[in-house]
């Protein structure tokens, strides 16, 4: 038996909230871009740097304040087996968690970051419920730190060193390479970066979703590391080679793969598995069409785009009982 998801977002009701967030967000993004270029000059003053930090803080505050109301709309639009999810997050509580997390991350030079993100995930998942039963997140910050170290920090060290040696403005004795050799080194670095990022995406997905709990039900993933990373890597490479045109198809194929390898278990017994039946060609046209409509309307159409894209993905996602 297949039980299906659905997404029933009312775009007209979501529009006022979206516009209230999007316009200030866009203004702050432009101001930050302009101010950051000013601070890059040799004559940048302390006041200009302070103004940039103030703008970044304002953007952070805006995002945090609107995050909960937006999630409340989006989560309540998700249905499973004709029953809606509910979200009971509080702006004050969420703002406090972020403020404390940012403070501790700064004074620990970023070391606390994984525990900060874990607390945010635990809170957001914990205030989400289905059929009056709350979900639970059991992920650990130490595990997330290990993921960051193994998939981002350590692999990026040689790439940064090579880039530094190639740049004459940074290195006192840059490597003597001809233009072709420099190009090949940059290409190799890019391919390695794709591999690193693919491993990071795999590890983050596994860390988050396999730590979700709903009553006695847990999610598990029956795929191995290298096949998963290889698939993500190939899709990223194709997106790069096509200058981003292929990106929607890449996203759909990765989503199909991740959903198809996700199982629901109860006490080590498989109860069901997820699946996705959406056609790549249909999704490719939908994603590009909705993206272009949002762009030409300067973002005003975005709520309708979110409603249509969300409905297509979720209505084609199902749970098949074992």
Regions found by a protein language model. Give the residues of each.
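Short, small/hydrophobic-residue-rich motifs at membrane-helix boundaries and re-entrant hairpins
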Residues: 1-83, 89-133, 137-243, 251, ...
